Amino acid sequence: MTDIKFGTDGWRALIAGDFTFENVARCAEGLCEHLNAMGMADKGLVVGYDTRFLSQEFAQTVANVCSAKGIKVYLSDRHAPTPVLSYNVLHHQAGGAAIITASHNPAQWNGFKFKPEYAGSATQEITDRLERSIAQLPTRSVGSIIDRRNSSLIVNMDPTPPYLDRIASLVDLDLIKDAGLNVYIDSMYGSGGGYLPTILSGGKTTVTEIHGSLNPAFPGIEQPEPIARNLTRISSLMAKGGASVGVALDGDADRVGILDENGQFVTTLDTFSMLAQYLLEQKKMRGALVKGVTSSIALNKLGEVYGVDVHELPVGFKNIGPKFSEVDAIMGGEESGGFAFRGHIPERDGILSGLYFLEYMATTGEKPTRLLQRLTDKVGPHYYNRRDIAFQISDRDRILNLINNPELDTIAGIPILDNDTIDGKRFHIKEGWLAVRFSGTEPLLRLYAEAVDQDIVTNLLDGAMQYLEI
């Protein structure tokens, strides 16, 4: 029997490998046990899915199992972004949401996310409890459970209208529509396809969307992750001239990638910092910022400038979300391009993130390169890069021993001033850092670096790879 483990955001596995109808049914049954134990079963469960291969059928399996267990299901009648489905937890006052999605993973993967009644990522405590519930289930066939489904408890619903109403209350959509922007959208064949063009229609602003159709193979891209190497087509289209900005969404639209007016990718660290500056400077909001450890030190500097607290947490919204809610932060986010905002859900929302960036442009009348210069003028230059390296599981202990070597005092000849282990290992240098951690969603070792000079960033990453012999 498969040992189901939840990472930084849900359980993910290879389709037809470990991600089977039997294991999805086990997840659903374990979730029912959890909801009953928490007194949430009577509130019902939102169930939705993304555009991946068999996602709709997997979601139907979840709905069937939950109805067989006597739990009402609000089943999405179409593929939908994770933040849209998460918001519907609040709209329906449900006990949570089960979402079939592998987010940004390659096409051969799928996943199972659980969003509790507060509409954010499940905490470590919740996922530990869920894992135990699943592990204790007796072995039984999917058919034996589904045969007992109660179709009267499955209510089909369109999750989009409540979400769009919420977005319209947060963002000045008329301002964006009347700004006359020329916006390029890359939906990466994911569940966010069509949302931004629909939201922004009916004004002077024009929208060109690519990869907006459903294609679970994600052709032409390595994976539906909005980072530079996967955005070559939108970048080349924008480079022809006339564009104002590019907005890319990942596979389930909870993350965003921004391209400037020249089609150049804006790092997610800069995007996070620019959006935070917008909220603090233009919208005059005050409150804490919550960041993952691999986010920019520019945020700490903004906190000093505007007199707000900055909290650092391990990577993953299962860690960031609770602190975001606890301190009523104005914004929370992480290096992956996932950002949450006060007044919405304590969860990443790529669509809202993109709209806030467009609102920033419409408010100031400035293009992305100028907005980035605003940030640099305020807190100085910051350069960043990340490398993802596949590794053999058998090599993990060797890598860990090298990372934790107490005698390590330089990387690429650059003195290490200090280190922390909030998540993986982060080495602090003068006005910068290098972080090394294992991904919580994929078999990858991630290296991150930030400094005030691009050459220093490159040297840190090259030096780390040489030291780790990877």
Q: Each predicted region: which residue ranges?
A:
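Phosphate-binding and adjacent anionic-ligand microenvironments
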Residues: V245, E281, M285-I470
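Buried hydrophobic positions in well-ordered alpha/beta secondary-structure cores of metabolic enzymes
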Residues: D9, V47, L85, A98, ...
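Active-site nucleophile and cofactor-binding loops and adjacent substrate-binding regions
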Residues: Y74-P83, F265-T268, V290-G292, L313-P314
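N-terminal small/polar loop signature for handling phosphorylated ligands or for N-terminal nucleophile
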Residues: E33, A41-W109, T198-L259
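Short glycine-centered, acidic/aromatic-flanked micro-motifs in structured strand/loop junctions
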Residues: G48-T51, P116, I185-S187, D260, ...
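An N-terminal, well-structured beta->alpha segment
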Residues: M1-K69, G95-G96, R149-V183
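Gly/Ser/Thr-enriched, mixed-charge loops and adjacent short helices
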Residues: M1, N110-G241
